[in-house]
Amino acid sequence: MRGILKYLALAAGYIFYIYFIAANRFGSDNMSYIDDMILHVQQKNATQPEFVQAATEVLDSIRPVVEANRTYQDWALLERLVEPERATVFRISWADDAGKVHTNRGYRVQFNSAIGPYKGGLRFHPSVNMSIIKFLGFEQIFKNSLTGLPIGGGKGGSDFDPKGKSEMEIMRFCQSFMTALYRVIGPNTDVPAGDIGVGGREIGYMFGQYKRITGQYEGVLTGKGLSFGGSLARTEATGYGLVYLVEEMLKNHANSIEGKTIVVSGSGNVATYAIEKALSLGGKVVTASDSSGFVYDPDGIDVATLKQIKEVHRARISEYAKERPNATFYEGKKVWGVPCDIALPCATQNELGAEDAKELIKNGCIAVGEGANMPSTTEATE
């Protein structure tokens, strides 16, 4: 009898072991393929919170489609989707105006080329790290595929801070950055663009260096000036597109932007041209911001003044309040406490949290249009 019990115990232990391995590899009855993948992403990228957040949101949103088609699991489609094809980290050394040498870190994540060459912007900001570049590159896959064009997804950048740097310092940094980057990009391989901290000026410096090194003039960078191969309306496209999308959303509810009070965060390309288009459709935009705080203008943001300050003088948003007598600058504050009908987060990732979302609802906001990459936290979305 004792021998039989021992045999049964060993058998039970073996069965449990097989079940444990199977559950971890293929998912148990209580854990779906999507749940397995979310856990896999969290465990494998534990030090990359932004990427984990983006991947989790995407995976959860495609749950019904994936779980209705076993083929995706059989071919390990999601395992391949969440892993970049190539990630490059490189050193950038450059000299400031005093001759002192500085070193920054550069990144290029080439996430997916299933339907075409990698495509995605370059971001210069001190917060840049591998997690942020991976999250941006991952989301770029889907944004690009939705255009219907044969382009894949990627992203890059550096922890270089352009604020407070002279024109020559920015030029030297961009040239050094491209000297390291040019080896992994090309018109049929990877086509970078601009993002935070990288506008037409920076793209021009990098394109010039690429042309100097390779002797080629092909369109390896988008966002160039019109005089050397750029596209009309490239600068305005994202901001205008955001407002057109919000207008169509409202039309589905027998409403429109006309006559609405709008708060916008940010003061870069996306924010500036979202403000411009919202004003042209009859909306009243009352805020703009940067990392130092925001301005509130009860008369409506004056786009010409905003462009002069941010694009020509490259000054802080606080300068706007000095030019407009009725405008007020709020240092270190967010725009979400300002009463509005529509909110357009156009600054950076995770800028709109759960408490901000509650504040918007309390103040009567009826629509949120996301212009930045993942501007709302998961809690805010819920």
Question: What are the functions of these language-model segments?
Answer:
Residues Y14-N30:
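Short, Lys/Arg-enriched N-terminal segments with co-localized hydrophobic residues
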Residues A347-E382:
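Rossmann-fold NAD(P)-binding glycine/threonine-rich loop
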Residues L5-L8:
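Short hydrophobic targeting helices and cationic amphipathic motifs
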Residues A233-K334:
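Glycine-rich phosphate/diphosphate-binding loop of Rossmann-like nucleotide-binding domains
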Residues M31-L232:
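N-terminal ligand-binding/catalytic initiation module
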Residues P117-Y118, G219-G230, V312-E323, W336-C340:
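Gly-rich Lys/Arg/Thr-decorated short loops/hinges at beta-loop-alpha junctions or inter-strand turns
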Residues E323, F329-C340, L344, A354-L360:
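A glycine- and small/hydrophobic-rich beta-loop-beta segment
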Residues E258-T261, C340, C365:
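Phosphate-coordination loops involved in phosphoryl transfer and adenosine-cofactor binding
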